[in-house]
Design a protein with these regions (language model features):
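Active-site environment of divalent metal-dependent phosphoester hydrolases
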Residues: 20-24, 42-47, 72-77, 93-106, ...
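Short, well-ordered secondary-structure micro-motifs
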Residues: 2-4, 26-27, 47-50, 76-78, ...
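Residue-level detector of beta-strand structural context in well-folded domains
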Residues: 54-55, 101, 126
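Active-site neighborhood of phospho(di)ester-bond hydrolases with catalytic His/Asp-centered motifs
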Residues: 12-18, 36-41, 65-68, 92-97, ...
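Core catalytic region of metal-dependent phosphoesterases/phosphodiesterases
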Residues: 1-59
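A generic structural signal for alpha->beta connector loops
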Residues: 32-34, 61, 109, 135
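Binuclear metal-dependent phosphoesterase catalytic core
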Residues: 3, 7, 86-89, 106-107, ...
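Active-site-proximal segments of metal-dependent phosphoesterases and phosphodiesterases across multiple
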Residues: 46-88
Length: 150
């Protein structure tokens, strides 16, 4: 994740769980960048300390629905994830859990982004660009793309 932050130089970082401590470490290493995060199913201790499994915030002027995804059963279907994101007025539904990168736009304009995993499973991150409160692009950067940016 550190390499991705150095390569992309984002205005904000979203960490979608498992290994909640990694998000806290990134926040300490890059104190000038706002880090938003949710715990994953492997962060059960964090959930017991009342860290919400779902958050919906305005990040860089864009309302984002953020969850790890295990409680939305994203390995089976995205239906519940999309329904909840729409109900909260989000412009994007961000999730993890599957470790499979996914970036697409629904017919109604809702962006859906799973960054994959930037850790030991190969390396990918999601990049979302915003302007004036709108998402202008979203994509997955895989490890070779990140290497080119360094």
């Amino acid at each position: 994740m550190r390499r991705a932050v150095n390569a992309v130089k984002p205005q904000a970082i979203v960490h979608l769980g498992d290994h909640f401590d990694d998000g806290e470490t990134v926040a300490q290493e890059f104190p000038h960048i706002r880090v938003h995060q949710v715990p994953g199913n492997c962060d059960a201790w964090r959930m017991m300390r009342y860290e919400p499994a779902v958050k919906c915030y305005d990040v860089c002027g864009v309302r984002l629905f953020m969850t790890h995804g295990h409680e939305h059963h994203v390995k089976q279907t995205l239906m519940r994830l999309l329904q909840d994101a729409r109900a909260m007025g989000a412009k994007a539904a961000l999730y993890g859990h599957t470790h499979l990168a996914d970036c697409h736009r629904e017919e109604d304009g809702l962006w859906v982004l799973n960054p994959g995993a930037c850790g030991s499973t190969g390396g990918s991150v999601g990049l979302m660009e915003t302007e004036k409160g709108e998402i202008i692009s979203a994509r997955i950067l895989k490890n070779p793309d990140l290497e080119e940016m360094l």
